[in-house]
UniProtKB/Swiss-Prot annotation:
Subcellular location: Nucleus
UniProt-listed InterPro entries: Znf_C2H2_type
Species name: Caenorhabditis elegans
Highest taxon of source: Eukaryota
Name by which UniProt lists this protein: Putative zinc finger protein F44E2.7
Amino acid sequence: MVKPTSSLLQRYKNNVRVDPSTLNHYLCYYCGKTLSDRLEYQQHMLKVHEVMSQSYQLWSDHTMDTLGLIWSESKRSYDRDTSCSLSVPASPMSRESRNRNSDDDYYDYVYEDEKPKRRRIDVEQSRRSVAAAAEKHRKLLEEQRRKAEAEYERKRKADEKKKEKAIKDEEKRKAEDLRKCLQLQQQKTAAAAQIRETAEKAAVARRMSTFEVGESSEQLAKPEGEKRKRRRTESRWREIESDSDKPEVTALVKKILEESKKKEASSQEVEDADLVPELSTRKPYDNTEHVSKLCKVCKKGPHYTFANLFEHYQDLHNATIKSLHYYGFNGNKLIGKKNLIERDHCQRCVIKFPRARDYFAHMIKHHVYESVRCQLDFENATNADVEARMMFRDRILTLGYNFKFEQVADPNLVSDVLEPGQEPSTSAEQEDPSSLKIVKLEEPELEEQKALKPESEAMEQQEDVHSLNPE
């Protein structure tokens, strides 16, 4: 590599006059810059604008020869053998003057001993190699991404299996603990039941032994007069029942026995209610059972009986019964109040009901008269009210009616007889009310009544002696 001489550099620096015929001006058609040297123009096109096609055209054979550069040995031998008539004449400027005029451009100068430029085929090969390398890199990245995803999926599945196994183990542990707890509870319950059963058996044995001792002592201490009174009463009722010549008396006896049983049942199916001060001014209903009524909800009707209206509210409007009351009146004065207790069976018909509403509907339809009539507090009542309160949505519906008792001429009868047609019959035989008014008979005394008067005992002893000695 030959460095430009100092004389050439000094001439450029001192701006030595040059022959105008040797000056050339080159204009850049990209940026408009004007250059006086062809080599500088070519370097400007290559460095600044990178115009390869223009540089290839500008670097002609003559220029290469002028600069002392050759394409190849074959090219130089071909140029020696062939002369070109259209070749550009050689520049009068010496070869030294065409060297670079600056130290910065010195290292960019192309010399003869350097390697030639790469050809187009090398560029294409380099492009293909770059594309192949990029494709290889892309495939490598894709393979790495695929491996990473597979590894992540494998780890995720392994974690899920671990979690499922932990959950199953926890469930098994809880089930085992629950089973052990239930087994222990059953053992404790069985032991407690056995202890309770043993204690109950011991208590029953003690009660039975005490009862046997007390019963034996009571039997020994019973008075002779009470035994004779019981025998006399039982024999008297047996004689009345066995007397076939008096069917009216027999029927009345049966009726009185039924009434006593009904009174006992009626006393068990109701409970007493306090008469609060505001109820003292209560008056009986004006309407009876058979007065037609309209529904207060749908305004439909008329309903000719209280039972039909009650069933209409229950079945059509799904109203629930809240309470059922009996009110006894002596004239217009309130003398008693009873609440019908909710039950799951009827004590008269021995019928069981799945719901309370069925029990109340059955009582209203079949037994309300005898249930009210048999109340002991209503013995002096002349009429009574039956009042039902039903809950419909957010309000309470009050239904009720009044019925009157028949005034019986004989006050010694146990119960008053209703008017014909008011009380539905609950037996197969229908009794004549007139026969019940004529005959008068005392009720059998209960076994619980132990206190007897001295006069009655004396009379019973005389009757027993007379029965033993009829003559």
